[in-house]
């Protein structure tokens, strides 16, 4: 029976890096993890509340770098309309920064640096592509059309290969059995440790139940 490993953890230290960068004593390590979770959860909730549409302001990842007196948070986004640094200058970013310091007590005694970076090719990121697929499936678009469109979007981002997998009752018919459908184009060398493969696993709730979505991009 095949044993599946997370492609990101498998390549950690070679082609992948940590999203949290800090050091703690062993007794304080769990507290540091909880702090990171609270920061990410607060940012996600703020953007979900303030976003303009379901396709805008999609977060790829949140990087946290903590030192003794400074907490640096970098938000990597695609199609950012909310957290823009244009006009008015950094208003929403400042609002988020203030609400983050108020909500999370351990940041209050440290300096908080918050930055937003827009991705040049958003659909080359599996997290953003996975959320796009989830939105399309929620709007009852055919899963085959969604997978083909996802492949086209990745090709425009000049990637070497993509694999998309959707699992669940995806046909849209009553009393249908759950199944797995996948589509691959190009090279996706999952067994090669030095291959820089990005991965995302997410799910979406539809009228037919929960669908699981996995995206590999090389």
From Swiss-Prot:
UniProt KW keywords: Chloroplast, Plastid, Ribonucleoprotein, Ribosomal protein, RNA-binding, rRNA-binding
Gene3D superfamilies for this protein: 3.30.300.20, Ribosomal protein S3, C-terminal domain
Signal peptide, first to last residue: none
GO CC terms: chloroplast; cytosolic small ribosomal subunit
Compartment(s) where it occurs, according to its Swiss-Prot or TrEMBL record: Plastid, Chloroplast
GO biological process assignments: translation
KH type-2 domain location: 39-120
A single GO molecular function term of this UniProt record: rRNA binding
Assembly and binders: Part of the 30S ribosomal subunit.
HAMAP family, A to Z: Ribosomal_uS3_B (MF_01309_B)
Similarity field: Belongs to the universal ribosomal protein uS3 family.
Name of this chain's protein: Small ribosomal subunit protein uS3c
Organism: Pelargonium hortorum
Gene of this entry: rps3-A
């Amino acid at each position: 029976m095949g044993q599946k490993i997370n492609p990101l953890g498998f390549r950690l230290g070679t082609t992948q890096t940590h999203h949290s960068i800090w050091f703690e004593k062993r007794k304080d390590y769990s507290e540091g993890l909880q702090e990171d979770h609270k920061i990410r959860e607060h940012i996600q909730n703020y953007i979900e509340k303030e976003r303009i549409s379901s396709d805008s302001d999609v977060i790829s990842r949140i990087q946290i770098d903590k030192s003794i007196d400074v907490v640096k948070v970098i938000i990597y986004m695609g199609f950012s309309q909310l957290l823009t640094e244009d006009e008015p200058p950094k208003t929403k970013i400042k609002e988020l920064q203030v609400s983050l310091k108020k909500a999370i007590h351990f940041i209050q005694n440290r300096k908080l640096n918050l930055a937003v970076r827009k991705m040049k090719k958003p659909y080359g990121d599996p997290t953003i592509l996975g959320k796009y697929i989830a939105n399309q499936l929620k709007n009852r678009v055919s899963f085959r059309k969604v997978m083909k469109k996802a492949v086209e979007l990745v090709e425009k981002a000049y990637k070497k290969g993509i694999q998309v997998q959707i699992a669940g009752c995806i046909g849209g018919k009553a009393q249908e059995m759950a199944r797995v459908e996948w589509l691959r184009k190009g090279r996706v060398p999952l067994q090669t440790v030095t291959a820089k493969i990005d991965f995302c696993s997410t799910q979406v709730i539809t009228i037919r139940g929960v669908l699981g979505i996995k995206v590999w991009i090389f």
